[in-house]
Swiss-Prot record:
Transcriptional transactivator. Its main location: host cell. GO terms for cellular component: host cell nucleus. Disulfide bonds: none annotated. It comes from Human herpesvirus 6A (strain GS) (HHV-6 variant A). GO terms for biological process: regulation of DNA-templated transcription. Residues 1-21, 223-242, 339-370, 428-472, 517-965, 1005-1068, 1086-1179, 1191-1223 are annotated as: Disordered. The lineage of its organism: Viruses, Duplodnaviria, Heunggongvirae, Peploviricota, Herviviricetes. Keywords: Activator, DNA-binding, Host nucleus, Host-virus interaction, Repeat, Transcription, Transcription regulation. InterPro entries: Herpes_IE2_3 (IPR005028), HHV6-IE (IPR005507). Interacts with human UBE2I in the nucleus. Although this interaction does not promote IE2 sumoylation, it represses transactivation activity. It is found in: Host nucleus. This is Immediate-early protein 2. It comes from the Viruses.
């Protein structure tokens, strides 16, 4: 149908045209209802009908037939009421409807022959005159039209329908004018979803019949005084001021219509913030990148060029509707506008999270019942409200997934581009299709819908593949899209294995074996916390760290294998951290049988809107720990082996262990730090805040071990995370474990009393814990933990604790454990106590062993004997371990012992030892806590979080291999549920994940963000050393290390893993803490880069174990020699990481896959991480006092300068230097604090780039004796030295332009009717005031047509040179010969040997296509130049053969010239 001419604002013609109008019955009824309610109820009519007119002063009485541009008549409310009542009384129902539509803006008076569509836009007529609509040759931006159409929140719009009654859908290309598009809405009332605009990114129109009145009221209540021009994104880009990433011209999130004015200067990018059309279609007219030139036709203040843009209403800013989304939606499911309004509360992550979660919970049922039918994908660049999640869900069920081809390539090992993520997305998509086939299941797993255990059973009854697929599908349904939107509710399904870590084939095999061993019934045995919060999704940045999610779903594996995958990811510690920890993160770790998939209650608010990976996926695979849980009476050797192997796997694959062991899994879930890994006690210790809450582990690992009883641990951990451990389960588990652990612990404690006590305690503790853990955890995990604990604890503790514990191992162990537990308890009584026990055990591996032994001993022996043994063992162990092995041995022992012994002893001695040891540990811990409490108290919250974080990092680190094993079948493992997956239309372009963002940034704009670094860097000794030093320094100095760690997560090929691990660690730490104060790491917000090696070293440090302790000692000596071997670097990393771990500066994590492989056992044990981190903090101080830290000695010997610089630089963000004179340096620029690899070390070894530059500058300054202040302008050698500093001018060294000369010059330029041969040059200095003025000037200029304004740019200056008379004479002679001779014979080979300098004086060039525009531009610029004569200077210059900057203006100039010539002759 061809629309007739719209009649513009002639509202009187509506009555005539209404003759042909057949109102929709439903619409008619709705409008009548509105009118009746408004007239009969207390609600005023104008409030209902005119929600937006009054705010704009655009109340349009019907009498105003011709509304001039600035003469909009304002009618009073009484007039409107009278008018409405009059109309109601006057006519029939049609009259009433007509009046209502006219007044409410539902009626669009565009002249359409057969039907009159209803338009939402109340202001459409006044804004756009009839002439504008009809004759506007410039195609209006459809988005503007769409925006105008959506002004009214009711959005009750009718499709034009033929006289025959059939609805007609108009595509954008068919519309007569872009401004008319709102009138041809894509709502097909008859066909619902069938007809949509496909060519333009329209947002679905809202259901016109749904909640009209409520929508009016909501719109009335919206805060119009708030500037909604800028949608709020959870990730504010750097310097984004709460707006989108305007500072990155390449950002796909950039909204071209947000702000009409450019960022005036200091942008190194192409184009303007809002005007960068380089990636936009050319069909948008230039004027729409500025304020439209509708001054005469637009009374609407939204289009008023002279009003402050900040006062624009949310209606104008397009923020009310996300029309960057191109998708069709079922009109029945379309939500009202209110969900699009970014409220101030939404800007606050916590508030928004809470609101959204509440809303989502409230809407769970309705959402679950909704049918996900949309076939389109959404690209979200804002945080959707809970209401909008329905649409997102639908989109997730879409069959079409816009994945780049390269994303589906078979090779998923590419770390630079997260192809695996895309593959996983693709797989997920396929699984989604499968899921669609089972649509009922899809609905069942709403994001907020918690599936019942019966549901889980039903799923389990399905094929394991289907189970995994279903879980992945359910989880991915929302998570990928929502992951960048941290405030949205979590996906319904929890995946236990959200670790980014990929296991090497041997590791995987081992894990697989363990899983098969534990295949018993993880599903039945593993309680999964319902409220498992998802691991924080750092918007896109966090996704970057969750590569392991791709690994999740090995959809083809049997449930056990699926679990193994999940566990594998968990074993990475990352996944466990996410999954298990996530559960705890919510703060409510409700243990539910694994059968019942853990349902995501919207607990993401706990994680600051970050998505915690659901633990659900854990359930399918029986955990070896589940199996071990029962065989608490394993042979000591077998248990030992199990603990060693499990420790190994769990340390590497702590998530596996935690997952495999239902208890461990619960623990990890409960503990949020996935401390479930091999040493459950360590888990508790790591999670000690949680474990202590169980209070079975009061100060000894025994309590932590209390966790080991699967139920007890899970509950205790859960409750620990909740601070409400289930004592009953802990008692039962402690009883069962206390029996076996009491035996082993009695042996261990008896041995711990002697030198062998350290070894034996490590063995016994590992045995007993291995028994307990074998009971709790799978045999494999118990083997691993026993191996690891036996190795590390027997070695480190045998050395350290054998020495000390041989002296008074029982005394020291009790003292150390009591001290550490006191410290920890003082830090966080329950958390701290668990940590303290873990720390005590952690401080001295002998402490840990002594703890375990003292725990078991206290159980077996008596409370008194447990006290004495704990004292002696803790003393000796604390002494020995506190020195050198404290960190490593505490890590290893805390892992092995903490896990095994803490499990077994926590069960067995949880009561007795928890009581006795709690008493002794409280006493001793009160002492030690007096020391550590100051540290702990200052760091208590941070430490707890950090410890948790470190633990999760540890676990994550060793197994953290970004490269997925082929054995896992990358194609199926590559599900990265949630945070890591973005379903954006242009996934690659919009993807802003940690490791994969770099390629989308122009490095010139983000010079500090480098593309993925080489793996070699991660393995560098330098990096490991620096990371060690960093860890050490942070460990000592900063309670904020966790935060720093987040910062440190950075992109690098190898660091991607580490970043994922770090991310997981964070999420784990967040989860464990259950606190929101640790905001998820946001990639964009992190400016510092940690070299991959540093991150790997930090992760390695987290993963340090007993064996690591030994190696640390060895390494200490080697480090002094600056060991370069990988093992040395690994050990260094381990040592550093112990320090670092305690420091919580896991942010240094340079989790190279190598590092993960190096410390598979050590890194993976999350428990040890906490113990070690807390212990290491204590131990660091002790070690520093007693013996120089390995890190310290090594760093001091080789990297004193480097370390200091690194420490300083780490916290500093490098500024982007535009100095062209420093191009060489620019290429070398690194994020501050990042250690250079040997290949990158330039002049001074191992200096971060910033320090290198500073040192260089210092040397140059010393050479020229330059100090702060001015330098004589005649001393060219000083001025043009090798420096990065710019010439700074507070006052511009130019004279203002003489007004008379300026006017004459402008007159002369414009006399011939051409201005393209002239330009305006603006010079201005650098200051905030000037910058603001220049921005305003730019706005004023860009409002005008035919104006071209350049970016403000700097200039690079070569040194000056005086020419002597001879050279000048030669030039004069050539000049006299004529231009040709001058050109041909001229030769000038003069050069200089100095350095160039740039100045901070900025320059801007303005062109105008016509003399009218030129004169106006000059006047505008001169106004600001006059106001700031010392900072802004104007120059007008002529251009030889000048032409317009772009050819678009050529016809304009020619047309003006021709008319000018013709008219000037008249």
């Amino acid at each position: 149908m061809e629309p007739a001419k719209p009649s513009g604002n002639n509202m009187g013609s509506n009555d005539e045209r209404m003759q042909d109008y057949r109102p929709d019955p439903m619409m008619e009824e709705s409008i009548q209802q509105i009118l009746e309610d408004s007239l009969m109820c207390d609600t005023s009519f104008d409030d209902l009908i005119l929600p937006g007119l009054e705010s704009f002063g655009l109340i349009i009485p019907e009498s105003s037939n011709n509304i001039e541009s600035n003469n909009v008549e304002e009618g009073s409310n009484e007039d409107l009421k009278t008018l409405a009542e009059h109309k109601c009384k006057q006519g029939n129902d049609n009259d009433v409807i007509q009046s209502a539509m006219k007044l409410s803006g539902l009626y669009c008076d565009a002249d359409i022959t057969h039907t009159q569509p209803l338009s939402d836009n109340t202001h459409q007529d006044p804004i756009y005159s009839q002439e504008t609509r009809i004759f506007s040759k410039t195609i209006q931006d459809p988005r503007i039209a769409a925006q105008t159409h959506r002004q009214c929140t009711s959005s009750a719009s009718n499709l034009p329908s033929n006289e025959s009654g059939s609805t007609q859908v108009r595509f954008a290309s068919e519309l007569p004018n872009q401004l008319l598009q709102p009138m041809y809405t894509s709502h097909n009332q008859n066909a619902n979803l069938q007809n949509n605009f496909t060519s333009l990114p329209y947002q679905p129109y809202h259901d016109p019949y749904r909640d009209i009145e409520s929508s009016y009221r909501e719109s009335r209540n919206t805060n119009r005084g708030y500037d909604y021009n800028f949608r709020h994104h959870s990730y504010r880009p750097r310097g984004g001021n709460g707006k989108y990433n305007y500072y990155n011209p390449n950002s796909k999130y950039q909204q071209p219509y947000k702000r009409c004015f450019t960022r005036t200067y200091n942008r190194r990018g192409r184009g303007h913030r809002s005007y960068d059309c380089s990636d936009r279609s050319a069909d948008l007219p230039y004027e729409h990148y500025t304020y439209p030139n509708y001054e005469q036709q637009n009374p609407d203040p939204r289009m008023n060029n002279y009003k402050d843009f900040t006062q624009l209403t949310n209606k104008f800013n397009f923020g009310a509707n996300d029309y960057s989304m191109a998708f069709s939606t079922d009109s029945t499911h379309v939500q009202s506008d209110n969900y699009n309004h970014p409220t101030k509360a939404q800007t606050i992550p916590e508030t928004t999270k809470t609101k959204k979660h509440k809303a989502t919970k409230d809407n769970e049922t309705s959402r679950g019942n909704q049918v996900l039918t949309s076939n389109d994908a959404i690209s979200l660049s804002y945080r959707p409200s809970p209401i909008k999640l329905d649409i997102i869900k639908k989109i997730y069920d879409t069959d079409v997934i816009p994945l780049p081809k390269e994303a589906l390539t078979a090779n998923g090992s590419n770390r630079d581009v997260d192809i695996q993520k895309y593959k996983k997305a693709h797989i997920r998509c396929r699984s989604v299709q499968k899921k669609k086939e089972r649509s009922s299941q899809t609905n069942k797993h709403d994001e907020n819908h918690a599936s019942s255990r019966s549901d889980l059973k039903e799923r389990k009854s399905n094929e394991h593949e289907d189970k995994a697929v279903t879980k992945a599908r359910d989880f991915s349904k929302l998570d990928p899209l929502l992951s960048p939107l941290p405030l949205t509710p979590e996906p319904a399904i929890d995946f236990a294995d959200h670790t980014d870590k990929f296991y090497s084939t041997p590791e995987f095999n081992q894990i697989k074996q363990n899983l098969h061993r534990s295949k018993t019934s993880l599903q039945d045995t593993v309680p999964i916390s319902k409220h498992t919060p998802r691991a924080p999704t750092k918007d896109n940045s966090y996704k970057k760290h969750h590569d392991s999610k791709d690994n999740y779903p090995k959809m083809k594996h049997s449930p056990g294998r699926t679990t193994s995958k999940k566990n594998t990811t968990n074993s990475n510690g990352h996944q466990n951290f996410k999954d298990v920890s996530v559960k705890n993160v919510s703060g409510k770790a409700t243990s539910t049988s694994p059968k019942s998939k853990t349902h995501h209650y919207s607990s993401s608010s706990d994680e600051e809107g970050q998505y915690k990976s659901p633990v659900k996926t854990i359930t399918p695979s029986p955990s070896p720990y589940c199996k071990l849980k029962n065989p608490s009476i394993m042979d000591k050797n077998s248990a030992k082996n199990h603990t060693a192997s499990a420790d190994k796997n769990l340390t590497d694959n702590s998530p596996i262990r935690s997952n495999l062991n239902p208890t461990a899994f619960n623990k990890s879930n409960n503990n949020k730090s996935i401390t479930n890994s091999t040493s459950n006690s360590d888990e508790c210790t790591d999670k000690k805040p949680n474990c202590n809450s169980t209070k079975n582990e009061s100060k000894d690992p025994n309590r932590t071990c209390g966790k080991n009883s699967d139920k007890h641990l899970s509950k205790s951990c859960t409750m620990a995370s909740k601070r409400a451990p289930s004592r009953a389960s802990s008692r039962t588990s402690s009883r069962a474990s206390s029996r076996a652990s009491s035996r082993a612990s009695s042996r261990a404690s008896s041995r711990a009393s002697s030198r062998a006590s350290s070894r034996d305690s490590s063995r016994a503790s590992s045995r007993a814990p291995s028994r307990a853990s074998s009971r709790d955890s799978s045999r494999a995990s118990s083997r691993d933990s026993s191996r690891d604990s036996n190795r590390a604890s027997s070695k480190a503790s045998s050395r350290a604790s054998s020495r000390d514990s041989s002296r008074a191992s029982s005394r020291d162990s009790s003292r150390a454990s009591s001290k550490a537990s006191r410290k920890a308890s003082s830090r966080a009584s329950s958390r701290a106590s668990s940590r303290a026990s873990s720390k005590a055990s952690g401080k001295a591996s002998s402490k840990a062993s002594s703890r375990a032994s003292s725990r078991a001993f206290s159980r077996n022996s008596s409370r008194a004997s447990s006290r004495a043994s704990s004292r002696a063992s803790s003393r000796a162990s604390s002494r020995a371990s506190s020195r050198a092995s404290s960190r490593d041995s505490s890590r290893a022992l805390s892992r092995a012992f903490g896990r095994d012994s803490s499990r077994a002893s926590s069960r067995a001695s949880s009561r007795d030892s928890s009581r006795a040891s709690s008493k002794a540990s409280r006493k001793a811990s009160s002492r030690a806590s007096s020391r550590a409490s100051s540290r702990a108290s200052s760091r208590a919250s941070s430490r707890e979080l950090r410890q948790i974080y470190c633990d999760s990092n540890k676990r994550q680190t060793p197994p953290h291999d970004t490269s997925i094993n082929t054995k896992f079948e990358i194609s199926e493992i590559k599900f990265r549920c949630g945070e890591d997956l973005n379903f954006y239309k242009n996934t690659a372009a919009r993807l802003q994940c940690f490791n994969h963002n770099d390629q989308f940034y122009n490095p010139r704009f983000r010079p500090h963000i480098r593309t993925n670094r080489k793996k070699s860097e991660s393995t560098n000794d330098t990096d490991s050393e620096s990371s060690m030093s960093r860890c050490k320094s942070h460990c000592r100095n900063s309670p904020d290390s966790l935060t720093i760690v987040r910062r440190k997560k950075h992109k690098s090929g190898s660091s991607s893993i580490s970043s994922s691990i770090e991310e997981n660690c964070r999420s784990n730490s967040h989860i464990v803490t259950g606190k929101e104060k640790f905001t998820p790491f946001y990639y964009q917000s992190s400016r510092t880069r940690s070299s991959s090696s540093s991150s790997s070293s930090s992760s390695a440090s987290l993963s340090c174990s007993k064996s690591t302790l030994k190696t640390c000692r060895k390494t200490q000596n080697r480090d002094n020699k600056q060991i370069k071997s990988k093992s040395d670097s690994k050990h260094k990393t381990t040592n550093m990481s112990s320090d670092y771990e305690s420091n919580r500066h896991a942010d240094v994590f340079r989790n190279s896959p190598e590092a993960g492989e190096k410390f598979p056992l050590h890194n993976s044990s999350p428990f040890n991480t906490h113990e070690q981190s807390n212990h290491s903090e204590n131990a660091i101080d002790e070690e520093q006092k007693k013996a120089p830290n390995i890190t310290t000695s090594h760093l001091h010997q080789k990297q004193n300068v480097k370390l200091h610089n690194t420490k300083k630089c780490k916290k500093k963000r490098p500024r982007d230097d535009d100095s062209d004179s420093s191009i060489k340096n620019f290429c070398k620029k690194r994020i501050s604090g990042a250690q250079k690899t040997e290949s990158e070390v330039s002049e001074i070894d191992d200096l971060c780039y910033r320090d290198y530059v500073r040192l260089k500058e210092r040397k140059v300054s010393e050479k020229f004796k330059i100090h702060r202040g001015r330098v004589a302008t005649k001393d060219f050698q000083k001025l043009f030295r090798n420096t990065m500093r710019a010439f700074e001018y507070k006052q511009i060294p130019k004279k203002p332009c003489n007004d008379k000369n300026l006017k004459e010059a402008v007159y002369n330029i414009c006399c011939n009717g051409l201005s393209n041969n002239a330009a305006i040059i603006m010079y201005f200095t650098r200051s905030k005031k000037v910058a603001q003025n220049i921005k305003i000037m730019q706005k004023e200029l860009m409002i005008r047509p035919n104006i071209t304004v350049s970016e403000a740019f700097k200039m690079n200056h070569a040194p000056p040179k005086y020419y002597d008379k001879d050279e000048i004479k030669r030039f004069i002679q050539l000049q006299k010969q004529g231009p040709q001779e001058l050109w041909d014979k001229f030769e000038n080979n003069t050069t200089h040997d100095l350095f160039t300098r740039h100045s901070d004086v900025k320059t801007m060039i303005i062109y105008a296509a016509t003399p009218i525009d030129f004169v106006g531009a000059v006047k505008t610029c001169n106004k600001y130049a006059k106001d700031n004569p010392k900072e802004i200077v104007l120059r007008v210059c002529s251009i030889i053969d000048g032409d317009n900057p772009i050819s678009i203006y050529n016809p304009i100039s020619k047309d003006f010239k021709s008319k000018f010539s013709t008219l000037s002759k008249c």
